[in-house]
A protein has these predicted regions:
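C-terminal target-recognition/interaction regions appended to catalytic cores
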Residues: 94-220
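Class I S-adenosyl-L-methionine
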Residues: 1-129
Length: 220
């Protein structure tokens, strides 16, 4: 059996009736011979310019004598503009029909909030305008509902990669597919924090050296 097992899921597992599934996962790990721990992490605390909360189950095999894992990253929060400062800001699908609501919508608020404030029927507008100085809200597969902080348009693929902490050279068959995949993914820098803690605290492995070795192999 692996020395360490890691699983993740949405924050909703900690709310209401869904808590029962969390207990089932923890119990199953124990049945399989592991000591599980539960962590709720925010991607923004892990160096990702995105506020995305995920539940991580991290379990070590019972025969491995190690102390409980300490996992509480406190990275400085990175705003959207800082993360995308050298990205071509002119690209991205424009939203000419949204101009009125985009200009009147405050950062991190939705068009629905604006329509309500104007006394208009809210309709089905749920688009959110990002803030230049704050991390992005949680990005999902439906990125069409998130608009740029400075321009009335959708985020382009390069911006989505930056806000998801994916490398600039991460390619997909099409930009649309790439944006969908990133919206459905746990940010790499977030999982890196978990991997680093496990390697250094439980496996006695220098994560930085391991990461550098892997990068060198990828460039050979």
């Amino acid at each position: 059996k692996p020395k360490v097992a890691i699983a993740e899921n949405v924050k909703g597992m900690l709310i209401g009736n869904a808590k029962g599934y969390t207990k089932m996962v923890m119990a199953r790990f124990k049945e399989l011979g592991y000591r599980p721990q539960l962590f709720l992490l925010n991607a923004a605390d892990c160096g990702v310019p995105q506020k995305r909360e995920r539940v991580f189950f991290v379990a070590v095999r019972n025969d491995i004598d190690v102390p409980p894992l300490k996992l509480a990253p406190t990275h400085r929060w990175i705003g959207c503009e800082e993360a995308c400062k050298d990205v071509d800001s002119g690209e991205g699908n424009p939203r000419p029909n949204d101009l009125k609501y985009w200009h009147l919508t405050k950062p991190l608020q939705s068009y629905s909030d604006t329509k309500k404030r104007l006394g208009e029927k809210e309709g089905c507008f749920s688009h959110i305008r990002l803030s230049a100085d704050d991390p992005a809200c949680t990005m999902t597969a439906n990125l069409q509902t998130i608009t740029h902080w400075k321009y009335p348009r959708e985020l382009n693929y390069q911006e989505v990669k930056r806000l998801g902490s994916f490398p600039d050279d991460y390619h997909a068959k099409t930009d649309k597919i790439g944006k969908y995949m990133i919206g459905m993914s746990v940010p790499p820098k977030m999982t890196e924090q978990v991997a680093r803690a496990v390697c250094e605290q439980w496996l006695n492995v220098n994560y930085s050296e391991l990461s550098n070795d892997n990068q060198a192999k990828n460039t050979d």
